Amino acid sequence: MTVLYTSASLKKMKCLAFNMGMNCVRTVSHARSGGAKFGGRNVFNIFDSKTPDSVRIKAFKNTIYQSAMGKGKTKFSAMEINLITSLVRGYKGEGKKNAINPLQTNVQILNKLLLTHRLTDKDILEGMNLAAGPVNVAIPRDITPQEEKKKVELRNRKAENMDLHPSRKMHIKELLHSLNLDMCNDEEVYQKISLYLQKNEESRTSVGASQQNHVDIDINSLKRYLQNIEKKARQKSAIDKQKKNQARIYQWNTQSFSEIVPLSAGNILFKREPNRLWKRLQNGISVFLGSNGGGKKSKTTKKVLQGNNILLHSLENNKDMTLSNNFDHSVFNINFTDLFGVINASGSPPDRVLNEINEIELKGWKCVGNLYDNNKIVVFQSSNPLLEDTKIPQKSFTNSKRFLISLSALLASFFAYYRYRLSQRQESKK
């Protein structure tokens, strides 16, 4: 086996060659790159995009390591200081704690991040590109005292509009105008809104003594509250209109509409007596032909629901309101549900609600549900039984049948007499 011995001179030559290679990697002509002093020596500019990225990153890491270990006095340029500071601040967990650290502390932190591989080459390259990019710095002009005064007034005005004060009546009117609410009685609306704000103020007294004179109101909640007031006002006006219409009842001549007659001035102004003989003849012919009119109509029982009246019962004040079947029920949003649904949604003791419902149902009403927007109001409908149309009496039907038979016999006799006279005339001519 051959053993090779390396002399000391050969080792020295290898070390010199290695150091020369490192210097070749680190150094480039200062005049060629237009560089600056980096790490205290005339080396290339690491922010030069013409230099390969790997070479720039490697040179930057080596200089940070040398400066952190205290090997020589390092002088960094302004761009390099910005790069070091941005890398330390940009790393997650180090930015806020070391935002105002001195340069040497930032170098120590950056070296630690590089050694633990928590900072990648991609992060270093992005930081170099950002630091080397052009920065537009616009120097703001001086603000005049008049402009500063206007800015303060505008800020105070915005802060004032954000608050709602119950003691200010004009502010409530402005809010109603912004919500496009056309209320007839502004005083009543103002009193209700003020009471609503006062309740909110009393409920917020536990927050703190400094906030007792300040009321923070949700605009959406206030808008829904005002919409409920407007809806109740529409319902009240509809009920009043329905009551006025009930007071004006006209006595129309129902006999003139019992049969289809041609429309004319005489039919409108004067009472028209129906022809009873012709009507009886029509009924008799209808029965004889087996049509659906006349007597056969009496066999078909037509069901008519008598009593569609609505009763609204309030569980709060125990008051009732009755609406006739001519009233437009679409104004009220009725929730049709069973008895258990009404009791559960009322929020009142079940025994009391059940007793009130039973008392009203004993008067001939039937519980059908409640109102969607107010579960305290129970809706009832009159529960009168289905009545049948009155049948034509059997005597009237018999009389019509007799009249029809008599008329048929009369026509047959007339036809037979006509044939008899015709045959006699023909015989006399012969």
From Swiss-Prot:
Ranges annotated as spanning the membrane: 403-420
Induction (UniProt): During M phase of cell cycle.
Membrane topology per record: Single-pass membrane protein
Subcellular location: Mitochondrion; Mitochondrion membrane
One GO cellular component term noted in the UniProt record for this chain: mitochondrial membrane
Keyword flag Iron: no
Keyword Mitochondrion: yes
Transit peptide: 1-27
Keywords: Membrane, Mitochondrion, Transit peptide, Transmembrane, Transmembrane helix
Domain of life assignment: Eukaryota
Subunit architecture: Associates with the mitochondrial ribosome.
Function field: Component of MIOREX complexes, large expressome-like assemblies of ribosomes with factors involved in all the steps of post-transcriptional gene expression.
Name of this chain's protein: MIOREX complex component 4
Primary gene name: MRX4
